[in-house]
Amino acid sequence: MKKALLMILDGYGISSTTHGNAVKNAKTPHLDNLMNNNPTIMLQASGEAVGLPKNQIGNSEVGHLNIGAGRIIYTGLSLINKEIENKKFFTNQALLNAIDHAKKNNSKLHILGLVSNGGVHSHINHIYAIMELANQHNVPAILHIFGDGRDVPPTQLLADLDQLIKKAETTKTKIGTISGRFYAMDRDQRWDRIDLAYNNLLSNTGKSFADLKTYVKDSYQQNITDEFIVPAYNNNYKSDEITIQDNDSVVFANFRPDRARQLSHYVFGSNYYDHHPQLRRKNLYFVIMMQYEGINPSAICYPPKIEKNTLGEVLKNANKKQLRIAETEKYAHVTFFFDGGVEVEYQNEDKVLVPSRKDVKTYDLAPEMSAAAIVDQLLKVYTKYDLTVLNFANPDMVGHTGNYEATLKGLEALDHEIGRLLADAKKNNITVFFTADHGNAEEMIDENNQKVTKHTTNVVPFSITDPNVKFTKKEGILANVAPTILKYLEIQIPEEMDQEPLI
């Protein structure tokens, strides 16, 4: 009866560069031995290999989703891009409902969203697609522009305006208002900011412009960049032609929830916040791109998809015992995200949350983090489980501080704990599957000697501590991990896992 342990090192990528590479330069004899003396290949952990757009850096959420699901999980940006490309977007029921509501009530369709190609909260192409859809159905559309300046250069909006204005003309869309994201997309309950943006949408109070480009240029003259553009309305139209009125449809084009939630609460109402605007329009049909926590709109374009037969569910159905263990910083990743982005409790499953250090503000001050406590707890219990899933946070969380020396220390402290774990696993005949969710600690100083704190697009290792295993490929993707473990444990791979085992 084989038993396995899946050890995920968060932010542990592989790069041939030596400069600024904490992974390569740390003294980690146990990890080196693990990779050099056991079957090892590399896995792609970024971009299209994990359901993100090409060349987009990986992240912990997406990484664990793909590892646990055994299939590529398409999220936010790439999911909607794909739908626009294959034209399914134009038959999306939530959007068609908004169109129908506007037609039935002889009213307007308002499009709210961050107008930028940053791809973090929204994408300008998604907004264009909604404008096209309204035009196809002869529904009057009003665009309310939120300036970015954070996920793109601070004055990118001006460069995008020619194309935007042209697109508005061809789709017969009126540009109604403009506001910097500082106001329209606040997430810290600074309601005075939301008030300015919201009142501008409802009743055209405050500043106005006759020419949008001039207004943006004038803002720049006053050192007000896209993010901070003061809410203003287009005075070429009567107020009720461009403001949100009773019976209108409203589509919020942002797919990321955190900065769309407060304005959505103002527009449509929710129980999420105690603070409410003085006025809300009646009988709105309010559509959001993806689920925003606490907001119950009329419809969601892409509601959360329940992934069937993730690794955890397959083990449960096979009556296998499983353990999930991580410190606080990454606990959600080995549970919620690993299970397909849902909270589930399986029978024969235990979850151990090891507290992250609270006595330090940043982890470069305690780069060992809680690795020792994780191993202490693990060694007491893990032999009774068929599969243990474990996350060590050090390479990622210390890597994010940009402190190279501390990251070396963190990796070396972690290696010591991994040494203890590997020795015990060997003694108990437990096979260790070792991988990472994305890169980070291997690129900490760039060629200009500047600190690098972000994730990378580098590959991650995949090692198995069984000399009898032979990999069938030289390289794979994160979604190959789950089917590989199932094959090793001689458990049938479900059809939902469309990625093949690598052994």
UniProtKB/Swiss-Prot annotation:
InterPro entries: Alkaline_phosphatase_core_sf, BPG-indep_PGM_N, Metalloenzyme, PGAM_B_sf, Pgm_bpd_ind. The active site is at S60. Its EC number is 5.4.2.12. Binds 2 manganese ions per subunit. Mn(2+) 2 binds at D10, S60, D437, H438. Catalyzes the interconversion of 2-phosphoglycerate and 3-phosphoglycerate. This is 2,3-bisphosphoglycerate-independent phosphoglycerate mutase. The gene is gpmI.
